[in-house]
Amino acid sequence: MTVMEFFALSAGEWMCQRTSHHLAFRRSEGGRSRMQIATLSPADPAVIQVCELFKVDPRRAVGAARVQWNGEQEWDNEEYKGDVVLVPIPDPDNPMRGQLLRDQGYAEKVPVAGTYVMGSDGALTLYTEYEMTESEERIWFASPNLRLRASTVKRFGGFSMASFCSEVRKLSASPSPISAVAESRSL
């Protein structure tokens, strides 16, 4: 599976439940969010803008994913919103890995270029180094409508946070055959 095939399988609305362990504080917290994922074509203005931000030829981009989220964490009960464009630039010698350009980072809210690897098991692993932190995030499908995500963030050479997230795809509200039969009998 290519990174764009992974993004295409991820397209849609997701309900997310996250548990984060803040190792320095010896504390864990839960969080919930809604996430919307859409694929973007290589010619999309957002893709071109991110490529230009990193001085990468936009013709090297194979597309992108736009991820938008809205959620809250138990620790501070603040609402978290965000919107990020992820632009993969495959390695010409091995398209299963490459650069991942982001207009906003995960651990630090700045534009960042990291790397990605598509595993033979279909999992996407993202590696990102920031000025003060580095993160590793692995995302995989347990089923077509269930994604799992595990991540670690290191600060100053030591682990500072580990997270696990389950993401369930929100399906359309079409009536099931059983409820349709029950509804027709009540008429």
From Swiss-Prot:
Enzyme Commission (EC) number: 4.-.-.-
UniProt cross-references to InterPro entries, sorted A to Z: Calycin, CpcS/CpeS
Name by which UniProt lists this protein: Chromophore lyase CpcS/CpeS 2
Gene that this polypeptide is encoded by: cpcS2
Family according to the record: Belongs to the CpcS/CpeS biliprotein lyase family.
Record flagged with keyword Lyase: yes
Lyase is among the record's keywords: yes
One GO molecular-function entry: lyase activity
Species name: Synechococcus sp. (strain JA-3-3Ab)
Record Gene3D superfamilies: 2.40.128.20
Membrane-traversing stretches: none
Keywords per UniProt: Lyase
One of the Pfam families matching this protein, by short name: CpeS
Role this protein plays: Covalently attaches a chromophore to Cys residue(s) of phycobiliproteins.
